[in-house]
């Protein structure tokens, strides 16, 4: 039995609370168990310089963690004057994941920036951020459609993410911090609602994993992401 008393194929309790903040065009509090992330989507009527005059938009993301989102206080990155490599890697991953399901031509010459701020961390902050960011993005696009600023919806599909790993030789879904810090293999999987893979990040922590292990982990991730997409759909209809 896992420390959380979950079955190997069981997600933590997942919730998407929409319209969580007042000012953003899209905002969501996403919870994966004790991991909680606020995702806000901001529409900007401009694009980065490399896209000016090209008739297409852009979707990007920023990621950060509050100082006491973890067991002991982390120093704010702003205080050191630069972002860590981990932060840069995660926010690029979130942006890539969102762009995979957006028709940037249909978005027009505007940019949507999704900020993902971790307020409490218990493992899986990047996968929770991606799953919540999609809901915030979808709400922001709904607002553009309602105002008549878009003639076609540029959102092609859902995107969601989950972690999987090998713990004591067993594939498990949605690792919390305790499992993540002691697992043999850690993998983050990003998929679309139609089952396409956007990104797979997998690392062995000392014990190599086999091809059979990888297939089992991907099957488990597919099952979990289908459930998360269903929860995204339910949240969007509420």
Curated annotation (Swiss-Prot):
Signal peptide: none annotated. The keyword RNA-binding applies. Its EC number is 2.7.7.56. GO terms for biological process: rRNA catabolic process; rRNA processing; tRNA processing. Transmembrane segments: none annotated. It catalyses: tRNA(n+1) + phosphate = tRNA(n) + a ribonucleoside 5'-diphosphate. It comes from the Bacteria. InterPro entries: ExoRNase_PH_dom1, ExoRNase_PH_dom2, ExoRNase_PH_dom2_sf, PNPase/RNase_PH_dom_sf, Ribosomal_Su5_D2-typ_SF, RNase_PH, RNase_PH_bac-type, RNase_PH_CS. One of its GO terms (molecular function) is tRNA binding. Phosphate binds at residues 86, 124-126. Keywords: Nucleotidyltransferase, RNA-binding, rRNA processing, Transferase, tRNA processing, tRNA-binding. Belongs to the RNase PH family. Homohexameric ring arranged as a trimer of dimers. PANTHER family: EXOSOME COMPLEX COMPONENT, EXOSOME COMPLEX COMPONENT RRP41. Phosphorolytic 3'-5' exoribonuclease that plays an important role in tRNA 3'-end maturation. Removes nucleotide residues following the 3'-CCA terminus of tRNAs; can also add nucleotides to the ends of RNA molecules by using nucleoside diphosphates as substrates, but this may not be physiologically important. Probably plays a role in initiation of 16S rRNA degradation (leading to ribosome degradation) during starvation. NCBIfam families: RNasePH. This is Ribonuclease PH. It comes from Laribacter hongkongensis (strain HLHK9). The gene is rph.
């Amino acid at each position: 039995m896992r420390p959380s008393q979950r079955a190997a194929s069981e997600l933590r309790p997942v919730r998407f609370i929409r319209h969580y903040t007042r000012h953003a065009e899209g905002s969501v509090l996403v919870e994966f168990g004790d991991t909680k992330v606020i995702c806000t989507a901001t529409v900007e009527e401009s694009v980065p310089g490399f896209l000016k005059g090209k008739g297409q938009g852009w979707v990007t993301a920023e990621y950060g963690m509050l100082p006491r989102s973890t067991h002991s206080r982390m120093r704010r990155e702003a205080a050191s004057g630069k972002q860590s490599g981990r932060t840069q890697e995660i926010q690029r991953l979130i942006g890539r994941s969102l762009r995979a399901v957006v028709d940037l031509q249909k978005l027009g010459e505007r940019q949507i920036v999704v900020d993902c701020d971790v307020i409490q961390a218990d493992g899986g902050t990047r996968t929770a951020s991606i799953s919540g960011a999609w809901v915030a993005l979808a709400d922001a696009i709904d607002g553009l459609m309602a105002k008549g600023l878009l003639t076609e919806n540029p959102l092609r599909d859902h995107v969601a993410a989950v972690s999987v790993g090998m713990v004591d030789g067993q594939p498990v879904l949605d690792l919390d911090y305790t499992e993540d810090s002691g697992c043999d293999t850690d993998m983050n999987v990003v998929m679309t609602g139609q089952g396409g893979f956007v990104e797979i990040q997998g690392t062995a922590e000392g014990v190599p994993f086999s091809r059979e292990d990888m297939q089992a982990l991907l099957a488990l991730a597919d099952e979990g992401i289908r459930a998360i997409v269903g929860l995204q759909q339910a949240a969007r209809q509420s």
